[in-house]
């Protein structure tokens, strides 16, 4: 490619509305342009990276035995009604009607479509297992699109779906996809971890996320210092404290706290250790519980894990916090004064709360708190459950080592769906015994466009992007100084350009009539890994300058050795 025949579209200024570095650099490097909220046009440089990612994904899917298909983005509503997700999915599912008043959705995922397809195509256990994949546009009507393509409404995704007659067969494919995903992200030179995860709205049993480690990540992921345990913080179990509850040393007393409506204010004003306080959170109760609200107790320095709480049978799904009006109607006090003593609601305490003594909590009277609360003496110990997020230093759930926490960007997710979709949609085959058998399913997703942003979050400096070779828009940039005035500079540049292309190298020749500083800045910004600078002065000694974008060091290479040198440097 020649810059004179290419849309480079680089920008010097950082866009004001770009929050994270990947969004900033994708705009500045001319990779994307915003069309509307959460909608982006991919420009040539962005498309080149996107295609590199796609190709790696496709190669490894083929190597893992998956078969490529292509399914419509527009899906009939009756499939979603049949699966039960028409009501469950929520406002992220964009629904519309066609001119015949028939309801449809823009697909955020394709479980229903693939299940409908396979139940009509497969009829015998002898045809299984099968694994199908596609690389297709998805749409989720995010309430707050942000971070550029990281959380866009329209995005490119690789989704795969496998069908089986036994759990053993599903596990075999699941393991193969786990291995394939590891190969995909390793080929892209990404620093990633596979972590245990919640299945979320997709459903199913076992699940792993593939997280690219980055400070800008939206997810907290936890690792054990003593084993290979790794999980999303939403999934990680907080073990019960091993120390027994300390005996009571304080009397129960009620204290005026008119200016303490939060745990932080209570701690500051009364010099209480925060680990001696309890937060009381009211959420909607499950309709079969016979109550409107249920109280959840967590220690003052801990955060409620909403995923864990939502799984409790006493709690309504989706988890919904009570409004101040609902709280006052039920308790007679505001949310800043709630506590478990004399509370006429079902109560569930976190494991760490169950071993507390002499603690403080709201008195269910505005402007008042109880101090010196003790279980069994002042109130009965309620139902106890794991309700909180783990924190650094907690014992690992496998009992080996302690936990550390890092930020991550989810780029892949694999699930063992079981019969969640196939059973309700009656996707059956004739089993070995001649009877109909519901197929068991797995599903496996990679956010292809999100991978591009995640790679930038890990690979950049103050001058721009530093692409890994495998997904760089161009592997080599040829920068000829004053080629329009120097015949020998132009001659070598053209010769090198032709030779590298013949070796299958993605190369860009900057043949613009631009100042050297502009040429250097643009190639650094778009992140070309290997740069060759050709100048008259160096040609006097039959040399060119090579600069590695990641290392930053320059070295002189003999003109006769350039091609061989570059082929040895490029990871292919």
Curated annotation (Swiss-Prot):
It is found in: Cytoplasm. Keywords: Aminoacyl-tRNA synthetase, ATP-binding, Cytoplasm, Ligase, Nucleotide-binding, Protein biosynthesis. InterPro entries: aa-tRNA-synt_IIb, aa-tRNA-synth_II, aa-tRNA-synth_II/BPL/LPL, Anticodon-bd, Anticodon-bd_dom_sf, Pro-tRNA-ligase_IIa, Pro-tRNA-synth_IIa_bac-type, Pro-tRNA-Synthase_IIa_type1. It is an enzyme of class 6 (ligase). It comes from the Bacteria. The keyword Ligase applies. This is Proline--tRNA ligase.
């Amino acid at each position: 490619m020649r810059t004179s025949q290419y849309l480079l579209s680089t920008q010097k200024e950082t866009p004001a509305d770009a929050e994270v570095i990947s969004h900033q650099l994708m705009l500045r490097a001319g990779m994307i342009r915003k069309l509307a909220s959460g909608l982006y046009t991919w420009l040539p440089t962005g498309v080149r990276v996107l295609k590199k990612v796609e190709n790696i994904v496709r190669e490894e899917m083929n190597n893992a035995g998956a078969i490529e298909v292509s399914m419509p983005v527009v899906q009939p509503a009756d499939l979603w009604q049949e699966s039960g997700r028409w009501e469950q999915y929520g406002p992220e599912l964009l629904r519309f009607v066609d001119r015949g008043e028939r309801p449809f959705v823009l697909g955020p995922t394709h479980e229903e479509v693939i299940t409908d397809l396979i139940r009509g195509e497969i009829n015998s256990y002898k045809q299984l297992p099968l694994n199908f994949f596609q690389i297709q546009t998805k749409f989720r009507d995010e309430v707050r699109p942000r971070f550029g393509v990281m959380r866009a409404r329209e995005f490119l995704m690789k989704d795969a779906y496998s069908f089986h007659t036994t759990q053993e067969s599903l596990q075999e494919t699941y393991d193969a996809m786990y291995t394939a995903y590891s190969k995909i992200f390793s080929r892209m030179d990404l620093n990633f971890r596979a972590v245990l995860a919640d299945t979320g709205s997709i459903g199913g049993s076992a699940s792993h996320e593939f997280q690219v480690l980055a400070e800008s990540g939206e997810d907290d992921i936890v690792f054990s210092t003593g084993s290979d345990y790794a999980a999303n913080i939403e999934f990680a179990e907080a073990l019960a404290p091993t120390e027994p509850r300390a005996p009571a040393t304080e009397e129960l007393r009620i204290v005026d706290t008119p200016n303490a409506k939060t745990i932080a204010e209570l701690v500051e004003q009364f010099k209480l250790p925060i680990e001696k306080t309890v937060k009381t959170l009211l959420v909607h109760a499950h309709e079969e519980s016979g109550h409107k609200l249920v109280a959840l107790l967590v220690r003052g320095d801990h955060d409620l894990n909403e995923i864990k709480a939502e799984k409790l049978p006493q709690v309504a799904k989706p988890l919904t916090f009570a409004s101040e009006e609902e709280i006052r109607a039920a308790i007679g006090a505001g949310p800043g004064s709630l506590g478990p003593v004399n509370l006429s609601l079902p109560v569930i305490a976190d494991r760490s709360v169950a071993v507390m003594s002499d603690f403080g909590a709201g008195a269910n009277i505005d402007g008042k708190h109880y101090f010196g609360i003790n279980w069994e003496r002042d109130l009965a110990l309620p139902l106890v459950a794991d309700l909180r997020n783990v924190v650094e230093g907690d014992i690992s759930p496998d009992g080996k080592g302690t936990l550390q926490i890092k930020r991550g960007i989810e780029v892949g997710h694999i699930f063992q769906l079981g019969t969640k979709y196939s059973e309700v949609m009656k996707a059956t085959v004739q089993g070995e015994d001649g009877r109909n058998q519901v197929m068991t399913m797995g599903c496996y997703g990679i956010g292809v466009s999100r991978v591009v942003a995640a790679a930038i979050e890990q690979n950049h400096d103050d001058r721009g992007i530093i692409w890994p070779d495998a997904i760089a828009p161009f592997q080599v940039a040829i920068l000829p100084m004053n080629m329009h005035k120097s015949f020998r500079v132009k001659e070598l540049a053209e010769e090198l350009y032709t030779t590298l292309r013949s070796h299958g190298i993605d190369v860009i020749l900057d043949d613009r009539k631009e100042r050297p500083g502009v040429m250097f800045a643009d190639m650094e910004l778009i992140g070309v890994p290997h740069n060759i600078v050709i100048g008259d002065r160096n040609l006097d000694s039959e040399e060119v300058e090579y600069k590695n974008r990641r290392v930053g060091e320059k070295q002189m290479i003999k003109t006769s050795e350039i091609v061989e040198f570059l082929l040895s440097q490029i990871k292919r």
